[in-house]
Amino acid sequence: MTRKNTTTNPWAKFHGPNLGYVIEQYDLYVTGAGSVDPELQELFEIFGAPSFQDDVVTGDNTATHFSPQNTGNIEKILKVVQLVEQIRSFGHTLAHINPMEDAANGQSLLEKAMNELSDADLKAIPAKTVWQDAPEGIHTALDVIHRLKEVYTQSLAYEFSHIQDSEERAWLHQMVESNSLRQPLSNKKRTALLKRLTAVEGFEQFLHKTFVGQKRFSIEGVDMLVPVLDEIVLEGAKNGVEDVMIGMAHRGRLSVLAHVLEKPYSHMFAEFKHAKIEGAVANSGWTGDVKYHLGREQVVSNEEVSTRVTLANNPSHLEFVNPVVEGFARAAQENRKKSGLPEQDTSKSFVILVHGDAAFPGQGIVSETLNLSRLNAYQTGGTIHVIANNAVGFTTDSYDSRSTKYSSDLAKGFDIPIVHVNADDPEACLAAANLAIQYRMLFKKDFLIDLIGYRRYGHNEMDDPAVTQPQVYKKIKNHPTVRAIYADQLQAAGVLNADEIETITQFTQEQLKSDYAQVPPADTSDATIHVKVPDVVAKGIQPIDTGVELDSLRAINEGLLSWPEGFNVYPKVKKILERRKDALEENGKIEWALAESLAFASILQEGTPIRLTGQDSQRGTFAHRHIVLHDTDTNETYSPLHRLPNINASFSVHNSPLSEAAVVGYEYGYNVFAPETLVMWEAQYGDFSNTAQALFDQYVSAGRAKWGQKSGLVLLLPHGYEGQGPEHSSARPERFLQLAAENNWTVANLTSAAQYFHILRRQASILGTEAVRPLVLMTPKSLLRHPLTLSTANQLSEGRFQPALEQENLGTKPNKVKRLVLSTGKMAIDLAAEIESGRHEYNLDEIHIVRIEQLYPFPAEKVQSIIKRFKNLEEIIWVQEEPRNMGAWHYMAPILFELAGDKVKTGYIGRPDRSSPSGGDPFAHKAEQELIVSHALDVKYNFRQDKLEIEVFSN
């Protein structure tokens, strides 16, 4: 028996989905058709059926009393509640967001659900029963449905139901449903928007007519991209943002440069004419790049605010700019002028990434970069993504380019709110932009705008798109531009008349003609066809003393071996660290990891910040670094490099996600924007670095030559043949050497801890100078603790990095030396170890060994001076552990031929050509390695072929 209590009505606090749930539970309670929560059962016993009594004001202003349990409307209320949620979640399926398609045809599940309820049913239900925050003027459920359909199924469509944070989801729905986003624009802003669209369209059409057939990758069809970027930049500036970073591909790039980044039309036209124009700022390197790859930096302002906007240089490798720009932003956000971790302020900058609709789901670098968005080492406080969606990728339709309904669907997996907007509705586009920037600034998370338009011409302007998309291009040919559509709307609304609209058009045309008239004729002088490397680059890195006083090194080492009282270091790690205690004393030896830590500390003390990332960089892949300690009881972390005295620069070391491409791009971008920082990326094994090959090819090796974009990024690539198979042996040095030219980077493979110490300090010393360049290091694995790679304290406190080293105790009788062996890295240590072992007898008087520590630029003068000492030299041999078609041989061969001259033979000893870098059998590997070593040291071997074992040949 229900004990009806009339003094209190607990149901009054239930609304919408919550009320629907309680009503559904009461139905189960009454019918006994299912289990009901005990607490609800008690409420039902005390208070009876859930009720909501209200006066329902209908369209004719008459009021009726409504009570669900009295009218038997429980099922209808549930359907309305479900319908409201379906509109919120699936309204996008009915929205008119594609200007090339008609509105949805009403066959969706959502439309069917709407048809199950009559207007009379909906009028009988009070609005607040199903929508607690129903705005003023919304009285019935019918009003609710009409209002929500207006919000969710027009030219703006929203996907928020996948957002896991309920606070964020509620905020998004409230922003949309309160209609604050769609407040009418002032006539002044509407006129300004039309002027902007007229400028964008006029610029593109002027290029089309003036430079017939030249590629420009027109923005036409998604013209609203420019005002959308304007709005985001302006609103960001109002929020105090100092830097806005933009990454985008070539589609629409020229218009963005001209309008958002204010590149003068005359400078754009000069690039098309191949003319020199006064005042043009060179933003390219000595080889340059095509105009639609170039970036720009510009302070953008209006009468109220200003901010710096950077459009990143970009190759045609779509989407690879994404992590680069994220690195820009993180660098701009961090204060690196104090010891410890950098201090990050995400309100100082943010990123806008403009994607293609085919590239966003198609390129894996997109998901790699999205995965960085909430990681401590990489998050930038939210990126605004804009898909410039023209529904076709070159000639490929969307049904052939993605497996999802929308090109934006990938973003759902990363909890990113999505707004689809019709690019032919300018004011809706601005509303989307406004929501995006507000969300980013409030929640510090990513947001995506799917700007759906079309492509008026082919992939480029010489391409005929009707060949592959004949039907849609019939539509596009007759479809008015967004400028024309908006001009008609403003004229119909009485904002502007026809004459005023024509005046705006004529003003744009006159401006374009005037700027074009400023451009001189094409420059056809010989100077324009000669590419000259700047002298400061051509002369390379000059010798730099990088030693550190011994007392300073000892003080640093003491600090490195200290940790807070009560901090429990893992016993095995503690033992490793304690072995380093006497390393800098008279008879001590310094291993690789300690040399690195000493270098880091000394660099920090000189005011240079350091950032190191990689998949296992805190500990080190080979358990050697231990630069971050973990308390065994609390898992609290501690890095001694954060507590050393006399440091006024930050140090950060992060374990990265299992990604190479995105992380390399990010670190490159960070370094470009923070040129004073020693930024290092470490591969888990060098073999895996090739998944970032596009970044090495397009950015790290060529960025300065193409764009004048300097970088001092350090790549640490573990390399060495130790019988671990083809996936854990080779960093493929041949690829980095193939890319080496014009002093674009340094490639090194070192043989001692001291050399590593000095090259790191040398690299730090050139940061922020014209001499700066990336450093590619083939780092050791088994050599990390090898006795022959250990160094003394004096070797760190004195001298500098040596590009070539001579093997000690060889070449002491110059007139007897017949064979000069050149090698690098682990191969050189294997040769030294064989000599030291004394296991075999060799005529060592007739041999000399030189370790090439710096492969590129090759230390020709040093090696030539060594060769001149040996008057009876007969042969110069390059010895390597990699197969002949890999490693350094093909890079070294022409160098050796030139060094040897006509009278001295040159030769190769190593494995023969192979398709795989290494074999999988450790015993076969060991046998091959022993043959290489013995043949290299046996002067009597005298060049023969043995394809089954190793390959030896001469010229």
From Swiss-Prot:
Organism of this sequence: Bacillus anthracis
Reaction(s) catalysed (UniProt annotation): N(6)-[(R)-lipoyl]-L-lysyl-[protein] + 2-oxoglutarate + H(+) = N(6)-[(R)-S(8)-succinyldihydrolipoyl]-L-lysyl-[protein] + CO2
Keywords assigned by UniProt, alphabetized: Glycolysis, Oxidoreductase, Thiamine pyrophosphate
EC id: 1.2.4.2
Pfam families: E1_dh (PF00676), OxoGdeHyase_C (PF16870), Transket_pyr (PF02779)
Xref: HAMAP family: SucA_OdhA (MF_01169)
Descriptive protein name: 2-oxoglutarate dehydrogenase E1 component
Family: Belongs to the alpha-ketoglutarate dehydrogenase family.
Subunit: Homodimer. Part of the 2-oxoglutarate dehydrogenase (OGDH) complex composed of E1 (2-oxoglutarate dehydrogenase), E2 (dihydrolipoamide succinyltransferase) and E3 (dihydrolipoamide dehydrogenase); the complex contains multiple copies of the three enzymatic components (E1, E2 and E3).
Enzyme category, top tier: oxidoreductase
PANTHER family referenced in this protein's UniProt entry, alphabetically: 2-OXOADIPATE DEHYDROGENASE COMPLEX COMPONENT E1, 2-OXOGLUTARATE DEHYDROGENASE
